[in-house]
Regions:
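Accessory nucleic acid-recognition modules appended to NTPase machines
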Residues: 1-122, 126-128
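Solvent-exposed adhesion/ligand-recognition segments of exported proteins
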Residues: 2, 177-178, 191-196
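Surface-exposed, flexible loop/turn segments at secondary-structure boundaries
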Residues: 48, 68, 132, 144, ...
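Short, glycine/charged-rich beta-strand-loop motifs at protein surfaces that mediate ligand recognition
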Residues: 80-81, 136-140
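Amphipathic, soluble alpha/beta structural segments
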Residues: 116-124, 187-196
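Active-site beta-strand-loop-beta-strand hairpin of nuclease catalytic cores
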Residues: 126-136
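Catalytic cores of nucleic-acid endonucleases
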Residues: 140-187
């Protein structure tokens, strides 16, 4: 019954018989409904990894991994693309939970970051409320280079970088880059300046 109600309600919002057109207002109503129903949540964007330049509601994530998998599998996306999107969604949920349950991360929702200088993006950006340092999180289901994240670190926009990967044993590179298995995302710390 719930699924039929959801479909009927979304159809009313997204499609009007009179016009046959989908408008921006209709799409915004549908997104609002999905948010209020706790089906999706949003991430805000930090421009150039600056916690003072935040743009709200910039990216959406599913709040349930099963629903995320279902909808992604219906798109016909290749397995590697689905795997990458699901791993990023998983980390979003971990960060969201930590923001709601602890006082270690700035913001009301997780942030991702853009780097205008090179037109790149960082999967997640964390401003620590413990040591007041900037942390980058790059989520990789495969062994990719994380060029934007490394450039942000090199240019002093980030203090530390976590590379979360699906198939790794973990490790440290140069003292500021940490490779962590994806399954340990909930255990990464945002107080490294106090530890190192």
């Amino acid at each position: 019954q719930g699924i039929r109600d959801l479909t009927a309600e979304l159809s009313k919002i997204a499609y009007q018989e009179e016009s046959g057109r989908t408008t921006k207002k209709m799409i915004n109503h549908a997104i609002s409904w999905l948010q209020e129903s706790h089906i999706i949540g949003y991430a805000s964007k930090a421009v150039d990894c600056d916690y003072k330049q935040i743009k709200d509601n910039s990216r959406y994530y599913f709040l349930d991994m099963g629903i995320a998998y279902y909808f992604l599998s219906r798109t016909g996306a290749p397995y590697d693309v689905m795997k990458g999107l699901l791993t990023e969604n998983f980390v979003y949920l971990v960060l969201r939970r930590r923001i709601e349950n602890t006082h270690e991360i700035a913001g009301l929702v997780p942030w991702f970051a853009s780097y205008e200088k090179i037109k790149g993006e960082l999967d997640f950006y964390v401003r620590s409320l413990v040591d007041y340092k900037n942390y980058g999180i790059e989520v990789k289901s495969t062994d990719a280079s994380a060029k934007t994240a490394r450039k942000l670190l090199e240019d002093g926009k980030l203090d530390y970088l976590y590379l979360l990967k699906g198939e790794t044993m973990g490790g440290i590179a140069d003292g500021r880059i940490f490779t962590v298995p994806l399954c340990l995302a909930d255990r990464i710390e945002f107080e490294l300046s106090k530890v190192l």
